[in-house]
Curated annotation (Swiss-Prot):
Assembly with partners or alone: Contains catalytic and regulatory chains.
Residues holding Zn(2+): C113, C118, C141, C144
Residue stretches in coiled coil: none
Protein name from the UniProt record: Aspartate carbamoyltransferase regulatory chain
Amino acid sequence: MNHLGDIMKNSLKVEPIENGTVIDHIKQGKALNVYNALDIKKDKTITIAMNVPSGKNHKKDILKIEGIELSKYDVDKISLISPNATINIIKNKIVINKFKVEIPNTIEGILKCTNPNCITNIENVAGKFDVEGREPLKIRCFYCEKFLNSIEVYK
């Protein structure tokens, strides 16, 4: 291999961020869902990496957002899309906090009930769900008690 090939082989494919958030271990193919769920301002520098090798025969997605620290609400949204994601808070190119997302016991204001007769679809009431199971995901509407599974939640 020539010198340029050696440099390319040993270099990073994506620049590290100075300050912001890296969402790692996003389920393969879900990075755009996470990006869309976060409603990030258009002036932010964002890197989306999809189908990145991760361990033996596994792939993951990664989302890097410069200048953003996520709220608990945002982290809860991510947990519903990719329950094994990891959040890294970066300051001056150093990881100052790293944690795995967790599906909360109660989900409020993130989802709407799929029951057309539920009060959340008739009046201006935010959706509220109790988590009944995590693997696989199963949630119950607080108001009408309709169950939703992971397929309905991840749409």
